[in-house]
């Protein structure tokens, strides 16, 4: 993962990385808003402050960047081992992955439906991501209707 950036350039790049209102979040939020869905963003009342929360349906959505959330970790990790500061990055991303699992378990335990999208999927297939969300809403409504009929 060698690059041609100086330490100062690398530092500046890293400082410019946002943790909320990222491009991938904005793209997905705009698509949901245009379909009439209203949501909370970075909802602090829930574990992990999910990027998008559809409180009406008890759905949380995380928009995960590939690097920081360790997509294809079995490929990325060996590449990171060759990089400067490899111990830091491997530890950081490993912990992010663990935290993602912990938060997801906690949210599921609290009765929330958790959806995760990779950033590139949001950017390349926004409509498909929205469709996944809409299908999840449909499934939840069907479950709700089924429970009402049983009672």
Regions found by a protein language model. Give the residues of each.
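Nucleic-acid endo/exonuclease domains
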Residues: 1-116, 120-151
């Amino acid at each position: 993962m060698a690059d041609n950036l100086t330490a100062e350039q690398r530092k500046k790049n890293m400082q410019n990385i946002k943790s909320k209102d990222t491009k991938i979040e904005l793209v997905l939020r705009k698509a949901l808003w245009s379909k009439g869905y209203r949501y909370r963003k970075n909802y602090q009342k829930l574990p992990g402050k999910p990027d998008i929360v559809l409180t009406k349906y008890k759905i949380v959505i995380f928009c995960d960047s590939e690097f920081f959330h360790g997509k294809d970790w079995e490929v990325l990790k060996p590449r990171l081992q060759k990089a400067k500061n490899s111990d830091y990055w491997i530890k950081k991303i490993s912990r992010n992955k663990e935290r993602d699992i912990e938060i997801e378990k906690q949210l599921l335990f609290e009765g929330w439906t958790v959806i995760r999208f990779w950033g590139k999927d949001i950017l390349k297939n926004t409509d498909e991501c929205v469709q996944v969300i809409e299908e999840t809403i449909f499934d939840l409504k069907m479950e709700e209707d089924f429970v009402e009929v049983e009672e």
